[in-house]
Amino acid sequence: MIDHTGIGVADVGRSAYFYDAALGALGMRRVMQIPENVGTDGIGYGRKYPVYWIDRYHPHSAKQHTAFVARSRADVEAFYAAAIKAGGTDNGGPGQRKPNYYAAFVLDPDGNNIEAVYRGD
């Protein structure tokens, strides 16, 4: 289980638009936002507390892969559709990857590999 993770992004506004849509499809929302005047302009997403952060990255930082827990196959499909519509790039559409692992992969606007996975059924 992921407690929290974070990535650096080139354009916080563009990425916030993407993650508002993609993570909104999984029932997540912005739960914390740090003003730029405190050294960053980070946004924390989650259901109750921030588990996923975006903030302005340093040019030499590595791209990330993060998997989010989905509540159903329908959530995986909603995540994928919302992420693509918000500017993401297909990196593996919704489908069964192995027994009890239904997932979809999207590259966010900065090339980070974002996954939604449902382990039920």
Task: Describe each model-derived feature in a short phrase.
Residues D41-Y80:
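Long, continuous compositionally biased terminal/linker segments
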Residues A10, K48, R71-R73, P109, ...:
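Short loop segments at secondary-structure junctions
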Residues M1, P59-A62, K98:
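Short glycine-enriched loop/turn motifs at secondary-structure junctions
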Residues M1-A16, T66, G120-D121:
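N-terminal beta-strand motif that seeds the catalytic metal site of vicinal oxygen chelate
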Residues I7-P50:
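Core segments of cupin and vicinal oxygen chelate
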Residues L26, Q33, G44, Y80-D121:
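Vicinal oxygen chelate
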Residues S15, Y19, V76, A83:
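Hydrophobic pocket/interface hotspot
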